[in-house]
Regions:
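C-terminal catalytic "cap/lid" subdomain
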Residues: 1-231
Length: 231
């Protein structure tokens, strides 16, 4: 990989809302194309890039009181597969070879998740999209992202959000929220920083996995993270 890179292999977590654009639900082709463009900018740097996609544009399992949590979570996992397929299509349309691996087997449309195979794809310059979360209910897609980051030996876990970093509170709700430049894992958990859930945080903490939070919509933000120029 080029010498100017801060990280040579990363796991990028994309929330489902990246795929719905101006809409609150479903897949907006323009939004997906925009995400694909950002991803390709990073790929062109020579970084090995794996992606975990969320499913919040279709479903949020944790918010359905009237349904068994496991069932609700499985529905959410299936939502992530739709996002993964849309992103794969957008990337391949721009001539970037991409593989989708699902944690729940769907052999007709994607490879099953096989760690060694995923790593071989990355080494061959393909982008790998991990779908269906971790395959287990009660675990968020953020936790799945942290898990996959460890498994593939990523140098960092990059979480794309609607805001440009970690804040003391949700800046969308409270404009006085303060941006945090650096914070320890334990502080983040204890202060209830909502960037990741506690399970994802503690997985990263136990394995010394750096977490970088950034706003994907900002031009070059992903490239800046990878080159280490973004604070």
């Amino acid at each position: 990989a080029p010498s100017n890179l801060q990280y040579r292999r990363v796991l990028l977590k994309l929330g489902g809302e990246s795929f719905s654009g101006e809409h609150s639900f479903g897949i907006d082709p323009d939004a997906v194309a925009s995400v694909a463009t950002r991803v390709i900018e990073a790929h062109k740097l020579g970084v090995e890039l794996a992606i975990v996609v969320g499913g919040g544009n279709f479903w949020r399992g944790g918010e359905n009181e009237h349904m068994n949590r496991a069932t609700a979570d499985y529905i959410g996992m299936l939502g992530t597969v739709m996002n993964a397929m849309a992103l794969q299509e957008a990337l391949e349309r721009l001539d970037v070879p991409t593989r989708v691996q699902t944690a729940i087997e769907m052999r007709e449309i994607a490879e099953p998740y096989i760690r060694r195979k995923a790593m071989a794809h990355l080494q061959d310059g393909r982008i790998v999209i991990f779908a269906a979360g971790s395959g287990n209910p009660y675990f968020t897609t953020d936790t799945a992202g942290a898990l996959r980051a460890m498994e593939i030996g990523a140098d960092a876990f990059l979480k794309a959000t609607k805001v440009d970093g970690a804040y003391t509170e949700d800046p969308m709700v409270n404009p006085d929220a303060i941006r945090i430049e650096h914070i320890t894992y334990l502080d983040a958990i204890n202060k209830g920083i909502k960037v990741l859930d506690a399970t994802a945080f503690s997985l990263c903490m136990d394995n010394n996995m750096p977490i970088v939070v950034f706003r994907l919509e900002d031009p070059d933000s992903l490239v800046q993270v990878l080159e280490g120029t973004r604070i």
